[in-house]
C-alpha cells in the first residue's frame, strides 16, 4: 500500500513539472488559451480523450460494468459518440473560425444579440460546476488513500491542478493531459483489464458465473441508454470545455481525424471499464457501492505498485477534466462576460478574436492567469463548502442541453436559423427545463428526485426545437452581410473573411 501511495504522490509532483514546462511555451494569450492552435494529431488526440474521460467514465464506468455487465459501457460509449459526431461533422468548421468561445460562434453566425450573451452565463455556470464536481471526485480518493480530511484533500489536489493550469494555461494542461492519457491507457488497458480477467478466471469463467443479462447490450435498460445519449452525446457537442480543445488543433484536418480517433478510443475505454467491472463481480458480489469497485480492484486484484498506477489513472482522469473546465470558465469570463458587464464591444467587429488580433502583451497574459487563479479558487471553495455539487452540475447540464443545444447546432447546420429564434429557443428551452424540474421536485418523494429526473431535459429540448424552427420561419432572415461573412469564414477560414 505504501508503494501505491508513493506512485500517486510522484504523479502529483510530476503534474507541477508539466505546469512549469508549459509556462515556457505560453508567450501570448493565444498560447495560453488554445495552445497557440498548434497541436498535431498525437497531442490533440490525447488531450481530447483526456478532457472527456473523467471520473464518471473511469470510476463510474467500472462500477456500471460491475452492476450491469457489458451494457455498463453505454455511458462512456455515449461520450465517445459525442466526440465522434463533433469531430466528423463540426470540428473542421470550428477550427477554421479561429475563435475562443461558443458565444463568439453565436455572434459570428447570428450577429450581435442576446443569444450569445445568454450562452456565456450558462457556459460559465456549467464549467464551474463541472470543475467542482471533478475536484470533489479526486479529493474523495485522497481521503481514502492518504487519510486526510476532505478540505485538505481538496486544497492539496485542487491546488496542484490550479498551479499547473495557471502557470502555462492550455500548454501546461495539454502536456499534463498527454501524460494523463498515457497513464490512463496503461492503467486501464495494459494493467487492470488483463489482470482483472486473469483473477476472474478468464472470459469463459465469467460466462459461467454471471447471468446472461451481464452479456446483453441492453441490460442497463433502454431508458438509461437514451438518457446517456441525450445528456452526454448532445452535451459534448456544445460544451465550452470540449470546443476549446477543438480550437487547439493545428488544422481542420487534425481536429477532424484526431477527434474521431479520440472518440473511438473513448468507446474502447468504456468497453474495457465494463469488462473490468464484470471481472470484479465474478470475484466478489459483496461490494456495496458501485463507485467503490475501481478502488477495490486496484487494491485487491492488482499487485502492489501496479495498483498504484491504476489509482493514478483514476486521479489523472478526474484532474484532466477539472483543469479543462477551469480554463474554459476563465476563457468565457474574460472573453465574453467581462465585456458584457463593462458594456464594451467584443474584441473585434464580428465578435471573435482572430489569430492576428490575439492580444500579445504581458499584461493580457497576466490577466488570463489571474482569472484562472480566481475562478480556480471559486471551484475549490465550492468543492469544500458544498460536498455534493452533483445536483448543481445536473441543473447546469440540463440547461446546457435543454436550453442551448438547438440554437448552437441549429446555427451550424441550418442557414435559415435567425438570432431572434436562437434567443427565444434558449429562453423557452431553459424555462421548460427548469419548470419541469421544479414541478417534479415539488411532487417528488425524495429530495433531488426531480432534479435528477430525465423529463426536464426532454421537455426543454422539444420546446426549444419547436420555437427555433417556427420563429426562424416567421422572422426576418439573418442579415445577408453577417450570413455571407459566416459562410466565407466557416468554409475557407479567417484569412479569407478578412
Task: Give residue spans per PLM region.
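Membrane-embedded helix-loop-helix hairpins and adjacent transmembrane boundary segments
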Residues: 1-498
Amino acid at each position: 500500500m505504501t508503494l501505491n501511495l508513493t506512485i500517486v504522490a510522484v504523479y502529483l509532483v510530476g503534474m507541477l513539472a508539466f505546469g512549469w514546462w508549459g509556462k515556457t511555451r505560453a508567450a501570448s494569450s493565444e498560447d495560453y488559451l488554445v495552445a497557440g492552435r498548434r497541436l498535431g494529431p498525437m497531442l490533440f488526440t490525447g488531450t481530447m480523450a483526456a478532457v472527456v474521460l473523467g471520473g464518471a467514465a473511469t470510476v463510474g464506468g467500472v462500477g456500471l460494468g460491475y452492476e450491469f455487465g457489458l451494457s455498463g459501457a453505454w455511458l462512456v460509449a455515449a461520450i465517445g459518440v459525442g466526440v465522434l459526431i463533433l469531430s466528423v461533422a463540426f470540428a473542421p468548421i470550428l477550427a477554421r473560425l479561429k475563435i475562443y468561445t461558443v458565444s463568439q460562434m453565436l455572434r459570428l453566425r447570428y450577429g450581435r444579440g442576446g443569444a450569445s450573451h445568454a450562452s456565456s452565463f450558462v457556459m460559465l455556470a456549467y464549467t464551474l460546476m463541472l470543475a467542482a464536481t471533478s475536484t470533489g471526485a479526486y479529493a474523495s480518493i485522497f481521503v481514502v488513500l492518504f487519510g486526510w480530511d476532505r478540505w485538505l484533500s481538496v486544497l492539496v489536489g485542487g491546488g496542484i491542478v490550479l498551479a499547473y493550469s495557471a502557470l502555462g494555461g492550455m500548454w501546461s494542461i495539454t502536456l499534463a493531459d498527454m501524460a494523463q492519457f498515457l497513464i490512463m491507457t496503461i492503467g486501464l488497458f495494459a494493467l487492470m483489464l488483463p489482470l482483472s480477467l486473469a483473477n476472474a478466471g478468464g472470459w469463459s469463467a465469467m460466462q459461467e458465473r454471471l447471468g446472461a443479462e451481464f452479456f446483453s447490450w441492453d441490460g442497463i435498460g433502454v431508458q438509461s441508454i437514451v438518457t446517456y445519449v441525450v445528456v452526454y452525446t448532445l452535451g459534448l457537442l456544445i460544451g465550452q470545455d470540449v470546443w476549446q480543445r477543438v480550437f487547439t488543433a493545428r488544422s481542420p484536418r487534425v481536429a477532424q481525424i484526431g477527434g474521431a480517433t479520440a472518440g473511438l478510443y473513448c468507446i474502447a475505454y468504456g468497453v474495457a471499464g465494463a469488462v473490468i467491472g464484470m471481472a470484479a463481480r465474478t470475484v466478489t458480489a459483496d461490494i456495496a457501492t458501485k463507485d467503490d469497485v475501481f478502488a477495490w480492484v486496484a487494491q485487491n486484484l492488482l499487485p502492489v505498485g501496479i495498483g498504484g498506477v491504476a489509482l493514478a489513472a483514476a486521479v489523472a482522469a478526474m484532474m484532466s477534466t477539472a483543469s479543462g473546465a477551469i480554463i474554459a470558465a476563465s476563457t468565457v469570463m474574460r472573453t465574453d462576460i467581462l465585456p458584457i458587464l463593462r458594456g464594451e464591444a467584443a474584441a473585434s467587429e464580428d465578435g471573435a478574436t482572430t489569430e492576428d488580433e490575439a492580444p500579445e502583451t504581458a499584461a493580457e497574459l497576466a490577466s488570463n492567469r489571474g482569472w484562472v487563479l480566481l475562478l480556480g479558487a471559486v471551484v475549490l471553495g465550492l468543492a469544500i463548502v458544498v460536498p455534493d455539487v452533483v445536483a448543481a452540475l445536473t441543473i447546469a447540464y440540463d440547461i446546457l442541453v435543454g436550453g442551448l443545444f438547438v440554437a448552437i447546432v441549429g446555427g451550424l447546420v441550418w442557414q435559415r436559423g435567425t438570432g431572434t429564434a436562437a434567443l427565444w429557443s434558449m429562453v423557452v428551452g431553459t424555462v421548460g427545463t427548469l419548470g419541469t424540474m421544479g414541478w417534479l421536485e415539488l411532487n417528488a418523494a425524495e429530495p433531488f428526485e426531480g432534479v435528477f429526473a430525465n423529463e426536464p431535459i426532454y421537455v426543454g429540448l422539444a420546446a426549444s426545437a419547436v420555437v427555433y424552427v417556427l420563429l426562424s420561419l416567421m422572422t426576418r432572415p439573418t442579415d445577408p452581410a453577417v450570413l455571407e461573412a459566416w459562410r466565407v469564414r466557416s468554409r475557407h477560414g479567417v484569412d479569407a473573411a478578412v
